């Protein structure tokens, strides 16, 4: 199993879930493992590319970008990844965010409220 933030080539560039099997294969097969797990894009999914490769994204516990406001995490059963979702009080989180003094809190709140990336 290989774990990377985005890809073996970059901490910032990673394929989206809509990428073709060929693109995912080209990015993650070079890791030399049957399961490749990455993060960075905040969109949880598991996809079996071939008999030799499964690619998974961990999603995001607190700032999902897939429209599902529940916290997402990846669970491994041996080498089999699956996505789990947990409800939490998003309104309470938004309220806490509004008074915390964090730079760009309004921008982060828009993303948290929609579960989608937003322009600042």
Regions found by a protein language model. Give the residues of each.
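Catalytic metal-binding/acid-base residues of hydrolase active sites
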Residues: 7-9, 40-44, 61-62
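Conserved catalytic scaffold of divalent metal-dependent phosphoesterases
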Residues: 1-35
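N-terminal start-of-chain detector that recognizes signal peptides
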Residues: 8-9, 26-29, 45-49, 54-56
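Short hydrophobic beta-strand that contains or immediately precedes a catalytic carboxylate
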Residues: 3, 38, 57
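Acidic, His/Gly-rich catalytic cores of divalent-metal-dependent hydrolytic chemistry
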Residues: 35, 48-120
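Hydrophobic, aromatic-enriched interface-forming segments
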Residues: 33-42, 47
């Amino acid at each position: 199993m290989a774990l990377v933030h985005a890809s073996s080539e970059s901490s910032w560039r990673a394929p989206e879930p809509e990428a073709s099997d060929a693109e995912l294969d080209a990015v993650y097969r070079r890791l030399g493992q049957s399961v490749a797990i990455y993060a960075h894009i905040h969109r949880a999914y598991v996809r079996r590319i071939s008999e030799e490769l499964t690619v998974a994204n961990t999603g995001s516990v607190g700032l999902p970008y897939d429209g599902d406001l529940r916290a997402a995490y990846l669970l491994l059963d041996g080498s089999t990844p699956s996505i789990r979702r947990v409800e939490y009080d998003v309104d309470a989180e938004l309220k806490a965010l509004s008074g915390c003094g964090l730079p760009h809190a309004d921008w982060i709140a828009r993303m948290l409220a929609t579960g989608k990336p937003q322009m600042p």
